[in-house]
Curated annotation (Swiss-Prot):
The keyword Cell cycle applies. This is Probable septum site-determining protein MinC. It holds the Pfam family MinC_C. GO terms for biological process: cell morphogenesis; division septum assembly; regulation of cell division; regulation of cell septum assembly. Interacts with MinD and FtsZ. The gene is minC. NCBIfam families: minC. SUPFAM superfamilies: Cell-division inhibitor MinC, C-terminal domain.
Length: 263
């Protein structure tokens, strides 16, 4: 076997699934001038957080009747403020065509996978008619099936006992994340459920990353770069204004508002 054959048997790549924290910008109005001003104000609050931030541009919430969207100009506005658009989420044909012309991936609209199937070919079947009982014949009562109580659903909990250093990312899939040590700046915690940090929280904490608005974040010392629940977040510049900065706190979500309270 030649050296070239041996090299061909050594794979040069791997395809892996990964849970990445990607910012979604949901455009509510087709008004690029207003977007430029508001985005500049937001980026000024946390310039380091928004620098080279990967972004999914969501156009599926745009109201009808606001005209054709200038997608290249929209992407340029985001680029000027450090946001790098990876993909477009859209449902309108003109937006999808514009994204494809720019060679941008197009994601399905929010909630598209949850829509019920529309099966048009199958007609409802008519139930078979049962013979009516003759006079004086008693109809037997159907037997009642015993109701079995539902088994309790337990969610797996991921426990980390060592410090989480900058550059590390820890994800608790399907459950809660408990960290029994400090979390350094630049570290990232993600969980489908709650996040508990029994030490200083100086990195990023993203709970309910798959949309669970009931998720919570608990930490003994709030000094985070970012806290997020179900996509609603606050960065360090916002958190420092809170009287709870540096204290033991509980973070919860009410509507679209993050509430930070003392433990």
């Amino acid at each position: 076997m030649s050296q070239a054959d041996l090299l061909d048997q050594d794979p040069v790549f791997q395809l892996k699934g990964s849970m990445l924290a990607v910012t979604i910008l949901e455009l509510a109005h087709n008004d690029l001038a207003r977007l430029e001003r508001q985005l500049a104000d937001k980026v000024a609050q946390a310039p380091n957080f928004f620098r080279d931030t990967p972004l999914v541009m969501a156009l599926d919430k745009l109201p009808e009747g606001e005209g054709r969207l200038d997608l290249p100009a929209l992407l340029e506005v985001c680029r000027r403020h450090g946001l790098r658009t990876l993909a477009i989420r859209a449902g309108r044909e003109e937006d999808i065509a514009a994204a494809q012309a720019l060679d941008l991936p197009v994601l399905p609209p929010s909630g598209a996978r949850e829509r019920p199937l529309d099966i048009k070919d199958s007609a409802p079947r008519k139930p078979a008619e049962e013979p009516s009982p003759s006079a004086g014949e008693a109809r037997p009562e159907p037997a009642k099936a015993e109701e079995k109580p539902a088994d309790p659903v337990s969610r797996p909990t991921k426990v980390v006992k060592t410090p989480v250093r900058g550059g590390m990312q820890i994800y608790a899939a399907g459950g809660d994340l408990i960290v029994l040590a400090a979390v350094s700046p630049g570290a990232e915690l993600l969980a489908d459920g709650n996040i508990h940090v029994y030490g200083p929280m100086r990195g990023r904490a993203l709970a309910g990353v798959k949309g669970d608005a009931t998720a919570r974040i608990f930490c003994q010392q709030l000094a985070a770069e970012l806290v997020s629940i179900a996509g609603n977040y606050k960065v360090a510049e916002d958190l420092r204004r809170s009287p709870q900065w540096g204290k033991a706190v509980h973070v919860s979500l009410s509507g679209d508002v993050l509430n930070i309270t003392r433990l």
